[in-house]
Amino acid sequence: MPRPHGSIGETKFKILAIIFSNESTGKESYGYNIWTIMKTQFHCYLEDINLRNIYRHLKDLEEAGLITKSAKQGVENAPKRQLYSITENGRQLKNKFNKYLQIL
């Protein structure tokens, strides 16, 4: 049975772990980067079409107050890049996504 829209499942915990890890190492978190890490480290969302699912999860996490989004100008004529940061509420869930931090 599918989870209710906006619930926090394993995919969202993986995304929180990625953003937390990126912040800890001084890296930026943006949709494409998060999707790439999901593919290479967690071996999920392997198809290009799955990128849109990552953005849906990011939107859910933002609406839940677990991450924030800010815009950063892209290089040259590229569009602005949406950067994601984990909030204090998101950090409080570290015990739920800690197992994924160990993979990263």
Q: What are the roles of these predicted feature ranges?
A:
Residues 54-64:
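Basic amphipathic alpha-helical segments that dock to polyanions
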Residues 89-104:
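Amphipathic alpha-helical dimerization/coiled-coil segments
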